[in-house]
Amino acid sequence: MQTKTLIIGNGEIGKSLFEVLDSVYECFIRGKDNTKEHFDIIHICFPYGDDFVEEVKRYQKLYTPTNTVIHSTVPVGISRKCGATHSPVRGLHPNLARSLCNFIKFVGGSDEVADYFRHAGMRVYLCRKPETTELLKLNSTETYRREIKAVQQLEKVCQKYGVPFAEVYTIATQTYNEGYSKMGYSEYHRPLLQPLQKTIDGHCVEPNHEIIEKNKIMEL
């Protein structure tokens, strides 16, 4: 399959995507010296910002792709405004190339893009709407954020009462999960996290929370 591919964004996501796709497709990462030419598919891998839609449309006009895939975390509805497919990246920083090959790759809105990723060796789950995958990613990082904050708070409460955090939370959660596994109900497992000794910085957790808050994503 000869699909001329351009990745726009040279951070961890862009570099990792290139590592996976380059062995299958004619693949480039956009640099300052890129000239105006046609690419069959462009991958948007730069962070969301106020001018995100305008930037995506500028690249679409410049490179005239048949398909545009947004891998960035964006507010619900942005991919549709761009006429793009959405496909969030999940996994462990900085080893995202390995994560791309091991996690199911959700694709929102395009059978053709789903087949493109399958041809590159990825396991794909196709959602009919890009809004589905946009909300999926926001919910994923927001859930992780809430769980981390809850564990941080519990550690402080344990210190207040002079009781061991390991017993109140770690061992209790481990044995809770073991019990449900033995009973055949692993779907009731609870996450087992360690309290961070600093603020939640990360690559995406707090920026994604800001997207949710600013755009009132979770409000009814």
Enumerate the language-model features and the residues they cover:
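Gly/Ser/Thr-rich loops at beta-strand to alpha-helix junctions
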Residues: 11-13, 73-78, 144
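Short, well-ordered alpha-helices that flank and scaffold nucleotide-derived cofactor binding pockets
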Residues: 19-23, 61, 214
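Rossmann-like NAD(P)-binding element
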Residues: 31-67
